[in-house]
């Protein structure tokens, strides 16, 4: 299997499957997917981060609320997950529904989820 084929197949994974893949690779090879931090750079980073406006947001489902079925439908539409995976995500709240999306898209997704009855926050 070529690297290009492997990358294409990984690209077809759902968010849940990709997360499971990362965990499996971390366990198998004893590594972490978290980036390494250099001490000198870490001290300067908070000042730089404060000056820059956040451009990517994570949409986090904090609670399903009263209309759980409607929330599951919206989660399925947003993520492309199957019914069981979407239900598990809603039942397991707080869960990240979408990662690293633009501010406009994050606000749109947040509105859709809130309209369905969910409690949502942006990180």
Swiss-Prot record:
It comes from the Bacteria. The keyword Nucleus does not apply. GO terms for molecular function: mRNA binding; structural constituent of ribosome. Keywords: Ribonucleoprotein, Ribosomal protein. InterPro entries: Ribosomal_bL12 (IPR000206), Ribosomal_bL12_C (IPR013823), Ribosomal_bL12_C/ClpS-like (IPR014719), Ribosomal_bL12_oligo (IPR008932), Ribosomal_bL12_oligo_N_sf (IPR036235). GO terms for cellular component: cytosolic large ribosomal subunit. Forms part of the ribosomal stalk which helps the ribosome interact with GTP-bound translation factors. Is thus essential for accurate translation. Homodimer. Part of the ribosomal stalk of the 50S ribosomal subunit. Forms a multimeric L10(L12)X complex, where L10 forms an elongated spine to which 2 to 4 L12 dimers bind in a sequential fashion. Binds GTP-bound translation factors. Belongs to the bacterial ribosomal protein bL12 family. This is Large ribosomal subunit protein bL12. It comes from Chlorobium luteolum (strain DSM 273 / BCRC 81028 / 2530).
